[in-house]
Amino acid sequence: MSIVNEIGKEGLKRYLENCAKVADIDIEDAFKVTVNCIKAHDGASINDDDMRQMKVLENRWYASLNSETPDYSVYSDPYYFCEVWMCWVKYSRRYLKEINSFKSMSGRSIVDYIGNIDNVIDLGCGFGYTTVGMKELFPNSDIYGTNVKDNYQYKMATELGEKHNFKIVENITQIENTKSSLIFASEYFEHFDRPIEHLIEVLEYNSPKFMLIANTFNGKAIGHFNEYKHSTNRYNGKEIGRLFGKTLREYGYETVDTNCWNNRPAFWEKKSSSKSPLAKFLMD
Protein backbone atom coordinates (compact mmCIF):
# COMPACT_ATOMS: atom_id res chain seq x y z
CA MET A 1 0.00 0.00 0.00
CA SER A 2 1.30 3.44 -0.94
CA ILE A 3 2.00 5.82 1.93
CA VAL A 4 -0.50 8.34 0.48
CA ASN A 5 -3.25 5.92 1.49
CA GLU A 6 -2.18 6.06 5.13
CA ILE A 7 -5.07 8.22 6.31
CA GLY A 8 -8.42 7.93 8.07
CA LYS A 9 -9.12 6.59 11.54
CA GLU A 10 -7.09 3.42 11.11
CA GLY A 11 -4.14 5.34 9.72
CA LEU A 12 -4.29 7.79 12.61
CA LYS A 13 -4.43 4.95 15.13
CA ARG A 14 -1.34 3.32 13.63
CA TYR A 15 0.42 6.66 13.60
CA LEU A 16 -0.34 7.39 17.26
CA GLU A 17 0.71 3.89 18.28
CA ASN A 18 4.10 4.62 16.72
CA CYS A 19 4.18 8.02 18.42
CA ALA A 20 3.60 6.33 21.78
CA LYS A 21 6.74 4.25 21.23
CA VAL A 22 8.92 7.36 21.32
CA ALA A 23 6.88 9.78 23.47
CA ASP A 24 4.62 9.76 26.50
CA ILE A 25 1.26 10.35 24.85
CA ASP A 26 -2.27 9.17 25.63
CA ILE A 27 -3.32 7.53 22.35
CA GLU A 28 -7.06 7.75 22.97
CA ASP A 29 -6.90 11.39 24.03
CA ALA A 30 -4.55 12.35 21.18
CA PHE A 31 -6.86 10.63 18.71
CA LYS A 32 -9.83 12.74 19.82
CA VAL A 33 -7.81 15.95 19.83
CA THR A 34 -6.43 15.30 16.34
CA VAL A 35 -9.82 14.46 14.85
CA ASN A 36 -11.32 17.61 16.35
CA CYS A 37 -8.45 19.77 15.09
CA ILE A 38 -8.99 18.47 11.56
CA LYS A 39 -12.72 19.18 11.81
CA ALA A 40 -11.99 22.71 13.04
CA HIS A 41 -9.51 23.20 10.19
CA ASP A 42 -12.28 22.21 7.76
CA GLY A 43 -14.59 24.85 9.19
CA ALA A 44 -16.60 22.92 11.78
CA SER A 45 -17.48 24.61 15.06
CA ILE A 46 -15.46 22.76 17.71
CA ASN A 47 -15.27 23.71 21.36
CA ASP A 48 -11.74 24.68 22.38
CA ASP A 49 -11.96 22.26 25.29
CA ASP A 50 -12.23 19.39 22.79
CA MET A 51 -8.80 20.25 21.39
CA ARG A 52 -7.37 21.77 24.53
CA GLN A 53 -3.82 20.42 24.25
CA MET A 54 -3.40 21.91 20.79
CA LYS A 55 -4.87 25.24 21.84
CA VAL A 56 -2.47 25.34 24.78
CA LEU A 57 0.47 24.75 22.43
CA GLU A 58 -0.77 27.34 19.95
CA ASN A 59 -1.32 29.96 22.65
CA ARG A 60 2.09 29.20 24.15
CA TRP A 61 3.76 29.70 20.80
CA TYR A 62 2.07 32.99 19.92
CA ALA A 63 2.55 34.35 23.45
CA SER A 64 6.26 33.71 23.03
CA LEU A 65 6.24 35.66 19.76
CA ASN A 66 4.65 38.61 21.52
CA SER A 67 7.59 38.65 23.91
CA GLU A 68 10.00 38.15 20.98
CA THR A 69 11.40 34.96 22.53
CA PRO A 70 10.08 32.14 20.29
CA ASP A 71 9.38 29.04 22.35
CA TYR A 72 10.82 26.32 20.13
CA SER A 73 10.16 23.74 22.83
CA VAL A 74 6.65 23.39 21.37
CA TYR A 75 8.18 21.07 18.77
CA SER A 76 9.18 18.68 21.55
CA ASP A 77 5.72 18.50 23.09
CA PRO A 78 4.13 15.08 22.44
CA TYR A 79 0.90 16.73 21.32
CA TYR A 80 2.70 18.46 18.48
CA PHE A 81 2.26 15.06 16.83
CA CYS A 82 -1.40 16.02 16.37
CA GLU A 83 -0.45 19.11 14.39
CA VAL A 84 1.98 17.17 12.22
CA TRP A 85 -0.66 14.54 11.38
CA MET A 86 -3.08 17.24 10.30
CA CYS A 87 -0.39 18.73 8.03
CA TRP A 88 0.12 15.30 6.51
CA VAL A 89 -3.57 14.68 5.89
CA LYS A 90 -4.45 18.15 4.62
CA TYR A 91 -1.30 19.22 2.80
CA SER A 92 1.83 17.15 2.16
CA ARG A 93 -0.07 13.96 1.25
CA ARG A 94 -2.05 15.93 -1.31
CA TYR A 95 1.14 17.39 -2.76
CA LEU A 96 2.57 13.91 -3.27
CA LYS A 97 -0.58 12.92 -5.15
CA GLU A 98 -0.55 16.15 -7.20
CA ILE A 99 3.01 15.79 -8.46
CA ASN A 100 2.41 12.14 -9.42
CA SER A 101 -0.83 12.85 -11.29
CA PHE A 102 -0.75 12.92 -15.10
CA LYS A 103 -3.08 15.92 -14.82
CA SER A 104 -0.42 18.02 -13.08
CA MET A 105 1.20 18.91 -16.42
CA SER A 106 -1.58 18.26 -18.94
CA GLY A 107 -0.88 14.66 -19.88
CA ARG A 108 2.18 13.91 -17.82
CA SER A 109 3.11 14.23 -14.20
CA ILE A 110 5.67 16.47 -12.57
CA VAL A 111 7.49 13.29 -11.55
CA ASP A 112 7.71 12.31 -15.24
CA TYR A 113 8.98 15.78 -16.13
CA ILE A 114 11.74 15.53 -13.52
CA GLY A 115 12.70 12.06 -14.74
CA ASN A 116 15.53 9.96 -13.37
CA ILE A 117 17.43 11.88 -10.71
CA ASP A 118 20.26 11.13 -8.33
CA ASN A 119 18.80 12.37 -5.08
CA VAL A 120 15.96 14.14 -3.29
CA ILE A 121 15.97 16.17 -0.08
CA ASP A 122 12.75 16.53 1.93
CA LEU A 123 13.34 19.65 4.05
CA GLY A 124 11.62 19.55 7.45
CA CYS A 125 10.37 16.03 6.88
CA GLY A 126 8.24 15.77 10.04
CA PHE A 127 7.71 12.16 11.07
CA GLY A 128 8.84 10.91 7.68
CA TYR A 129 5.73 10.01 5.68
CA THR A 130 6.51 12.50 2.89
CA THR A 131 10.04 11.13 2.75
CA VAL A 132 8.61 7.63 2.32
CA GLY A 133 6.46 9.08 -0.44
CA MET A 134 9.51 10.52 -2.18
CA LYS A 135 11.18 7.11 -2.05
CA GLU A 136 8.08 5.61 -3.67
CA LEU A 137 8.10 8.24 -6.42
CA PHE A 138 11.87 8.09 -7.00
CA PRO A 139 12.81 4.52 -5.99
CA ASN A 140 16.24 4.61 -7.62
CA SER A 141 17.28 7.91 -6.05
CA ASP A 142 19.06 8.58 -2.77
CA ILE A 143 16.46 10.14 -0.48
CA TYR A 144 17.18 12.37 2.52
CA GLY A 145 14.96 14.04 5.10
CA THR A 146 15.97 16.84 7.46
CA ASN A 147 14.65 17.52 10.93
CA VAL A 148 15.77 18.86 14.30
CA LYS A 149 17.82 16.15 15.92
CA ASP A 150 16.72 14.39 19.11
CA ASN A 151 13.07 15.42 18.96
CA TYR A 152 10.32 12.82 18.72
CA GLN A 153 9.74 13.35 15.01
CA TYR A 154 13.42 12.80 14.24
CA LYS A 155 13.30 9.46 16.05
CA MET A 156 10.20 8.32 14.17
CA ALA A 157 11.55 9.44 10.80
CA THR A 158 14.86 7.69 11.45
CA GLU A 159 13.06 4.42 12.14
CA LEU A 160 11.03 4.81 8.94
CA GLY A 161 14.24 5.56 7.07
CA GLU A 162 15.78 2.30 8.21
CA LYS A 163 12.70 0.47 6.98
CA HIS A 164 12.30 2.28 3.65
CA ASN A 165 15.93 2.95 2.77
CA PHE A 166 16.33 6.69 3.22
CA LYS A 167 18.44 8.77 5.60
CA ILE A 168 17.47 11.43 8.13
CA VAL A 169 19.95 14.22 8.90
CA GLU A 170 19.80 17.38 10.99
CA ASN A 171 20.65 19.74 8.13
CA ILE A 172 21.72 19.63 4.50
CA THR A 173 25.39 20.22 5.30
CA GLN A 174 25.49 16.61 6.53
CA ILE A 175 24.69 15.36 3.03
CA GLU A 176 27.91 14.61 1.16
CA ASN A 177 26.58 15.21 -2.36
CA THR A 178 25.96 18.93 -2.14
CA LYS A 179 24.31 19.20 -5.56
CA SER A 180 20.89 17.63 -5.18
CA SER A 181 18.50 17.02 -8.03
CA LEU A 182 15.29 17.93 -6.19
CA ILE A 183 14.39 19.70 -2.98
CA PHE A 184 10.87 19.30 -1.58
CA ALA A 185 9.73 21.74 1.11
CA SER A 186 6.16 21.54 2.39
CA GLU A 187 5.18 24.08 5.05
CA TYR A 188 8.87 24.41 5.95
CA PHE A 189 10.26 27.90 5.44
CA GLU A 190 7.46 29.47 7.52
CA HIS A 191 9.13 27.98 10.59
CA PHE A 192 12.09 30.36 10.27
CA ASP A 193 11.83 33.99 11.32
CA ARG A 194 14.42 34.74 8.61
CA PRO A 195 13.28 32.49 5.75
CA ILE A 196 15.13 34.40 3.03
CA GLU A 197 18.47 34.00 4.77
CA HIS A 198 17.73 30.31 5.24
CA LEU A 199 16.71 29.92 1.60
CA ILE A 200 19.99 31.53 0.56
CA GLU A 201 21.89 29.10 2.79
CA VAL A 202 20.13 26.19 1.08
CA LEU A 203 20.78 27.54 -2.42
CA GLU A 204 24.41 28.46 -1.74
CA TYR A 205 25.18 25.02 -0.35
CA ASN A 206 23.00 22.87 -2.55
CA SER A 207 21.85 24.57 -5.77
CA PRO A 208 19.27 21.91 -6.75
CA LYS A 209 18.06 21.47 -10.32
CA PHE A 210 14.39 21.37 -9.22
CA MET A 211 12.46 22.67 -6.22
CA LEU A 212 8.90 21.87 -5.13
CA ILE A 213 7.83 24.40 -2.52
CA ALA A 214 4.56 24.96 -0.66
CA ASN A 215 4.72 28.05 1.56
CA THR A 216 1.92 29.53 3.66
CA PHE A 217 3.55 32.58 5.21
CA ASN A 218 0.10 34.06 5.87
CA GLY A 219 -1.18 30.93 7.62
CA LYS A 220 -1.58 30.70 11.38
CA ALA A 221 -0.05 27.55 12.86
CA ILE A 222 2.23 26.43 15.64
CA GLY A 223 5.74 27.45 14.60
CA HIS A 224 4.68 30.11 12.09
CA PHE A 225 5.52 33.77 12.68
CA ASN A 226 3.35 36.88 12.74
CA GLU A 227 6.01 38.73 10.79
CA TYR A 228 9.28 37.80 9.16
CA LYS A 229 12.70 39.43 9.04
CA HIS A 230 15.25 39.97 6.32
CA SER A 231 18.41 41.96 6.92
CA THR A 232 17.22 44.87 9.11
CA ASN A 233 13.65 44.89 7.78
CA ARG A 234 10.40 43.25 8.87
CA TYR A 235 7.79 41.86 6.48
CA ASN A 236 4.28 40.50 6.67
CA GLY A 237 3.49 37.12 5.17
CA LYS A 238 2.51 38.44 1.74
CA GLU A 239 5.61 40.60 1.47
CA ILE A 240 8.01 37.84 2.49
CA GLY A 241 6.34 35.52 -0.02
CA ARG A 242 7.10 37.97 -2.84
CA LEU A 243 10.69 38.36 -1.65
CA PHE A 244 11.02 34.57 -1.51
CA GLY A 245 10.08 34.27 -5.18
CA LYS A 246 12.36 37.16 -6.12
CA THR A 247 15.27 35.45 -4.40
CA LEU A 248 14.70 32.23 -6.33
CA ARG A 249 14.57 34.12 -9.61
CA GLU A 250 17.79 35.97 -8.77
CA TYR A 251 19.42 32.58 -8.30
CA GLY A 252 18.43 31.51 -11.79
CA TYR A 253 15.17 29.66 -11.06
CA GLU A 254 11.99 29.96 -13.08
CA THR A 255 8.53 28.63 -12.30
CA VAL A 256 7.30 25.73 -14.40
CA ASP A 257 3.61 25.88 -15.29
CA THR A 258 1.51 23.16 -13.68
CA ASN A 259 -2.14 22.43 -13.02
CA CYS A 260 -1.62 21.89 -9.30
CA TRP A 261 -4.48 23.30 -7.27
CA ASN A 262 -3.69 26.84 -6.12
CA ASN A 263 -0.18 26.33 -7.58
CA ARG A 264 0.81 24.21 -4.60
CA PRO A 265 3.43 23.01 -4.55
CA ALA A 266 5.09 25.62 -6.74
CA PHE A 267 7.46 23.99 -9.21
CA TRP A 268 10.80 25.75 -9.79
CA GLU A 269 13.54 24.74 -12.22
CA LYS A 270 17.06 26.16 -12.35
CA LYS A 271 17.51 27.66 -15.82
CA SER A 272 20.60 29.79 -15.29
CA SER A 273 23.80 29.28 -13.36
CA SER A 274 24.23 33.01 -12.80
CA LYS A 275 23.07 34.68 -9.64
CA SER A 276 23.31 38.03 -7.96
CA PRO A 277 26.05 38.43 -5.34
CA LEU A 278 25.05 37.21 -1.91
CA ALA A 279 25.80 40.66 -0.48
CA LYS A 280 22.99 42.12 -2.60
CA PHE A 281 20.42 40.03 -0.74
CA LEU A 282 21.81 40.81 2.67
CA MET A 283 21.62 44.54 1.94
CA ASP A 284 18.09 44.62 0.44
Predicted features by range, described:
Residues F184:
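A conserved beta-strand element that flanks and buttresses the S-adenosyl-L-methionine
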Residues P208-F217:
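Conserved beta-strand signature within the Rossmann-like core of class I S-adenosyl-L-methionine
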Residues Y188:
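Hydrophobic adenine-recognition pocket in adenosine-nucleotide-binding enzymes
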Residues D118, S181, K209:
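Conserved acidic residues
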Residues S2-T178, L199-I200, F217, A221-D284:
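Conserved N-terminal segment of class I S-adenosyl-L-methionine
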Residues H191-F192, K220:
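Short glycine-rich, flexible loops that bind phosphorylated cofactors or substrates
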Residues F192-V202:
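A short, conserved alpha-helix within the catalytic core of class I
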Residues E204-N206:
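Conserved helix-to-beta-strand junction in the class I
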